[in-house]
Amino acid sequence: MKSLLDLFKQFTPDEHFDAIKIGMASPEKIRSWSFGEVKKPETINYRTFKPERDGLFCAKIFGPIKDYECLCGKYKRLKHRGVICEKCGVEVTQTKVRRERMGHIDLAAPCAHIWFLKSLPSRLGLVLDMTLRDIERVLYFEAYVVTDPGMTPLKKFGIMSEDDYDAKRKEYGDEFVAKMGAEGIKELLEGIDIEIEIEKLRGDLTGSEVKVKKNAKRLKVLEAFKKSGIKPEWMILEVLPVLPPDLRPLVPLDGGRFATSDLNDLYRRVINRNSRLRRLLELKAPEIIARNEKRMLQEAVDSLLDNGRRGKAMTGANKRALKSLADMIKGKSGRFRQNLLGKRVDYSGRSVITVGPTLKLHQCGLPKLMALELFKPFIFSRLEAMGIATTIKAAKKEVEAGTPVVWDILEEVIKEHPVMLNRAPTLHRLGIQAFEPILIEGKAIQLHPLVCAAFNADFDGDQMAVHVPLSVEAQLEARTLMLASNNVLFPASGEPSIVPSQDVVLGLYHATREKINGKGEGLVFADTGEVQRALDAGEAELHAKISVRLTEWTKDKATGEFVPETKLVDTTVGRALLSEILPKGLPFSNLNKALKKKEISKLINASFRKCGLKDTVVFADKLLQNGFRLATHAGFSVAIDDMLVPPQKAEILARAEAEVKEIEQQYVSGLVTAGERYNKVVDIWGKAGDDVSKVMMDQLKVQKTIDRNGKEVNEESFNAIYMMADSGARGSAAQIRQLAGMRGLMAKPDGSIIETPITANFREGLNVLQYFISTHGARKGLADTALKTANSGYLTRRLVDVTQDLVVTEDDCGTSNGSLMRAIVEGGEVIESLRDRILGRTAAEEVLHPETRAVLAQPGRMLDEDLIEELEAAGVDEVKVRTALTCETRYGLCAKCYGRDLGRGGLINLGEAVGVIAAQSIGEPGTQLTMRTFHIGGAASRAAVASSVEAKSNGIIGFNATMRYVTNTKGELVVIARSGEIIIQDEHGRERERHKVPYGATLTVKADQNIKAGTILANWDPLTRPIITEYAGTVKFENVEEGLTVAKQVDEVTGLSTLVVIDPKRRGSAKVVRPQVKLVDADGKEVKIPGTDHSVTIGFQVGALIQVRDGQEVGPGEVLARIPMEGQKTRDITGGLPRVAELFEARSPKDKGMLAEMTGTISFGKETKGKVRLQITDPDGKVWDELVPKEKNVLVHEGQVVNKGELIVDGPADPQDILRLLGIEELSRYIVDEVQDVYRLQGVKINDKHIEVIVRQMLRRVVVENPGESTYIAGEQVERSEILNTNEALQAEGKLPATYSNVLLGITKASLSTDSFISAASFQETTRVLTEAAIMGKRDELRGLKENVIVGRLIPAGTGLAYHQARKAKDAMDEAERRAIADAEAAELASAGTHDAAAEIDGSADTAD
């Protein structure tokens, strides 16, 4: 008892712990926690306000109300500490024990715990092997369950209604026992022998799939009970714990009323019903009355634990559902997300931000009043230290008076004490940065303009929050890691984040443009000082081309010293003057061009790589100052005259209108269908809009001027609008097009495009109809933005949750695996160069020179800019690099596999939370992604349909492996491959471009042909899809019957008739037949596919227009039928954010394509209604077959050989199939490419490695296939690291390891299936997660960041990783020491013991004689 009291006397530092275990409490355990039983439902006495004895707030059970004072007032003061008052029974101690002492309620009848009953899957149901419905009927007294059949034929676990029971009682008498309510269930649970059940189930894992699945589930639950040592009957409560009263307070309001926690109401109900039941049982009340009371008690306990999970929720006086224990921990306002993960911070303030153009990058302006409030404790301590104030109270007065000395002290305190600024929403780590405060007048925080990009802030009323790091460690971290001048790169892409924008860009761009025949052109200057004087004197203008003598500093690689080099440079006045701010070591050539935004970004990047961080920050600041100054001097203005409407516009519009008229004519005469007409019209107008904007830009771009020789020449325009867009300061070509070109096509609310475009632009003005059409797009834009923000935030949350425990934990895992990286080429354009893909990665194997085979890079070497330049010069076109997916570190990642830390520019540090960085990098641009693919201010954008492909570079033609073609009678090559590609290679055999060619295209080039850029490689009809024969012969129709499978369509104008294949659903005949063509040779025999005995059969799809007649002779490559392509709205491509979410959730796309399960030959089997049977036979004769719906487009034909994983039925691929058939690397490539496609469309740069990190987390679980000699069950999902550890242990013992297959989980699923139950519970489905964890008696090893935040420890990342590692090492040392001491003592005791024993034996020998 004494030690217990000592506990309460002083505050004990919390114990170090390394894991948290959750379990279920037995009734004994609950009673051991309790300090007494709560017998009465009363709370406090409303006259005296003292708690009632034995009530819910009883002082005897829970502790005193006032510190060290019993309830009746007999014992007061500290000297009686620990005395229990004999009058009122209260222990004299601190009040705070009322927060930790629990009570209990002894239930008069057992009650089931609703979580184990109703949270799906029902654990009670699994253990008892009964349905939830049946258990509920028993628990709520609607039916009996047989607990002991005795000698009767009744089954144990059998359910019987009341009438059945009465009948059986009459029949068998007292032979059997059947019970109702929780007692019956409890008895059944007690009767279960877990060991025997497990044995039985392990032997029964055969039979139908449903049965196996069910048994495996049950087995898992029983194994969990066995492993955790929890007894199943504990799921039924006999004792209910009562929460300490201070955690469910009763607060007196003014006016003599009380506000109470809902829990008190719920407890009151339980106690009332419990006492009533107890009384009824004592009185031996009729069964039916007691039964009703028991049911009500069960319901009351249910509501207390989880109100509203079953039946109607219990409500209080005001018809509002009461908040139960479960509600307090789940959801956004529950314990986890509101209080543990969403704590509020003291020492913080917020205010509006304004611009601080005079600040240095690492400074921010802090209003004096705010600083005074934030730094109060520091000021107080200084005042006391200086002896100005003697007490805190006096210091407070001094500060409130605002004497001059206080302000002096504030200056002193603030010096070198960084503060953190945060702008909500904090989407990535640059949303919080540290600055050194500068005291300013006024009430707004001043922010440096260059950090706005990182905060995504602007000065239109944004607010920011200030936080003060208090401890020295916190200040140190803020200073070294978070200072704004240390964060100059975006962690998402490694691009500089301190790039100037808007007016600064405009100023720099204007100053660095050149003008033909400007004043002072051709002058030569000795140095920049002379240039400045000439400019000031008006002898030379800013844009004049001149020559200047400049000194450049280059770094000597050997010595590392700067060497000056002076030379004459051709440049302009503006650029020459800017050269003064270049840091040493950066050549002037970087600056000797018109500085657009991209160029400035490159300039800062080059400076960072060549001159280091410090010089770059200073340089960026100087650029900013100059940009502001130059923009002011430039005196830009925009007038309506600057929006030049091209004179060719009228002509283009007239041409388009004529074309539309023609299409209308064709439609009226029935040459084209309504769908085709709409498509073509939209196409014509889309093209017209593009043409107008092209001539407009061409006109804006140039202006005529007279050069020095008096000749008229064109030069780049100085038009203000053009300069703004061209420099990247503001606006885009699409916006200028709306100002001066034409607005173009608009979209309807449902996303379809209105076929009449807005031909006017904003300069000419819109008429009423045009305005009306535009309003919709504008409104939709606003609505979309709101939706998008919420969606994007949720995506980020899921991503963070799945990756939060991924931290760099070691230097090198030593793997030699990796994935091959090559440039991404699409449609002949290099979308992403090899350089961008491998920069900052680690080579996985030697990189060899393609020709000399010399080693250019050793494995394990990081590929930096210089090395990549060497590789590019050598012509390396693919490199195997290490990736996050192939890293073999168990918990976490290794630095080599991750590569460069993009935010800092060096190899990643140990302890960096790369998972969270990846999640933020993908989530942060989410708000920029469109919800739907079109809409630029409502304007519809769509690509004109491509009908040919041309080469962009010179080279040699090659085809990919799957390309196949035939030569038709005209000698043209016709493509019959579904995934054919033309590859153009240079003379070294390096791939330059790659073009997809559709089925049925005509090739205009041959293999190995040398071509020039601009050559047309292939062309095709974009509006129809052909069906082509590969072989020659005579057409023989099968099942082509008019009115049954085909319909005749007669063209009214031309009188020609065509046959159209119609849908079998609309046919009279029940027998399903598919119209097809067989080919017959001259002898009337069916043509066979060479090398097989399959006849050539070509099936027609629904909607195909048959182009040949029965008995017609056809040659190879001839078109048998055409399928018109339907309108372009039909397959809505999910674009933007939903597409990214879909990929990361690993959802199967609707209308998914089908991949070949194995390599083999295609054949078609017997058809069923509406489906085709597709078969693949592999070389060993194994057959795989699948039914494919007829409306699907089958890409293969009889006798074709396909490879495993090849697309055989058209449609988007399912990532699960890709993983199963093609493996992890292919899957990762698919997801990375698809996600990047979405972001690239918006011009957002994200490094591949972030996406790889997330794919790694999606693949972290595996499915056990064959458990070997492990304890797993086949089909069980386990963590990859866990099974690897288990297998290592098994192999060490010479046992059979478990085999497993990869499984891809969506991010939500992966977050919930994490090993850490704390993390999963705080994410989603709290109840389910906790129920499962409790049954399994799970241990949370606190590996991730989230768990540690929740339990309030330092996170195991960054500086915290070192702390935890040091602590663990120390604990291990202490443990070893303790063991050593214990062993030594034991040895000593043992040796002493042997002495004694020897002495005893001697003694006994003596006494014997």
Swiss-Prot record:
Keywords, sorted A to Z: DNA-directed RNA polymerase, Magnesium, Metal-binding, Nucleotidyltransferase, Transcription, Transferase, Zinc
Binding site residues for Zn(2+) 1: C70, C72, C85, C88
UniProt signal peptide: none
Official protein name in the record: DNA-directed RNA polymerase subunit beta'
The UniProt record lists the keyword Isomerase: no
GO biological process: DNA-templated transcription
EC top class named in words: transferase
Subunit structure: The RNAP catalytic core consists of 2 alpha, 1 beta, 1 beta' and 1 omega subunit. When a sigma factor is associated with the core the holoenzyme is formed, which can initiate transcription.
Function: DNA-dependent RNA polymerase catalyzes the transcription of DNA into RNA using the four ribonucleoside triphosphates as substrates.
Record-listed Mg(2+) binding positions: D458, D460, D462
EC number(s) stated in the UniProt entry for this protein: 2.7.7.6
Cofactor: Mg(2+); Zn(2+)
Family, as annotated: Belongs to the RNA polymerase beta' chain family.
Cofactor, free-text remark: Binds 1 Mg(2+) ion per subunit.
UniProt: Zn(2+) 2 binding residues: C813, C887, C894, C897
Gene3D superfamilies, alphabetized: 1.10.132.30, 1.10.150.390, 1.10.1790.20, 1.10.40.90, 2.40.40.20, 2.40.50.100, RNA polymerase II, clamp domain (4.10.860.120), RNA polymerase Rpb1, domain 3 (1.10.274.100)
Bilayer-crossing regions: none
Keyword Nucleotidyltransferase listed: yes
Molecular-function GO terms, alphabetical: DNA binding; DNA-directed RNA polymerase activity; magnesium ion binding; zinc ion binding
Superkingdom, taxonomy of origin: Bacteria
Pfam family, one: RNA_pol_Rpb1_3
Catalysed reactions listed for this entry: RNA(n) + a ribonucleoside 5'-triphosphate = RNA(n+1) + diphosphate
Gene Ontology cellular component annotations, sorted alphabetically: DNA-directed RNA polymerase complex
InterPro entries to which the protein is assigned, alphabetical: DNA-dir_RpoC_beta_prime, DNA-dir_RpoC_beta_prime_bact, RNA_pol_asu, RNA_pol_N, RNA_pol_Rpb1_1, RNA_pol_Rpb1_3, RNA_pol_Rpb1_3_sf, RNA_pol_Rpb1_4
Protein's organism: Acidovorax sp. (strain JS42)
